[in-house]
Amino acid sequence: MIFVSKVHGNIEYEEKDKITFKKGILGFENLKEYALVDLKECEPFKLLQSLEDDEAGLIVVCPFEFFKEYEIKLSDEDTTRLDVKNQSDVVLLTTVTLDSDPKKITTNLKAPIIINISNNLGEQIILDKSDYKIKHLLIEE
């Protein structure tokens, strides 16, 4: 299938790869269906594009690419809501805020996006009891 994004143009995806966020994503609670798109020219970044709004897309990244020590513990409620049967089915991403100065690019370690790739259910969770920041510099000096 092809989705036309105002910002990123034609985005090809398979229906089986559509990710459903039952509660939406913070700031986009009314949008539930997304596609995760590789940005080959900007690896390791990816685009989480809404399939319901051609202007709604988020740049995301696997936080472990930049923060080897980053860790979260999914609650039993999280794993139940996402129907996680196997930890290897969980993909963890964080949203990225871009800046023309690469030293000012930030990522949200406080509210990661969790995707169960076995059933394509996703959810953004908030880590209440952590010292992680909403705007954590991606490249620390």
Swiss-Prot record:
Q: Where in the cell is it found?
A: Cytoplasm
Q: Name one GO cellular component term.
A: cytoplasm
Where is it mostly found?
Answer: cytoplasm
Q: Which UniProt keywords apply?
A: Bacterial flagellum biogenesis, Chaperone, Cytoplasm, Translation regulation
Q: Its domain of life? A: Bacteria
GO terms, biological process? bacterial-type flagellum assembly; regulation of translation
Q: What does this protein do?
A: Acts as an anti-CsrA protein, binds CsrA and prevents it from repressing translation of its target genes, one of which is flagellin. Binds to flagellin and participates in the assembly of the flagellum.
Complex and partners: Interacts with translational regulator CsrA and flagellin(s).
Family of this protein: Belongs to the FliW family.
- The protein's name is Flagellar assembly factor FliW
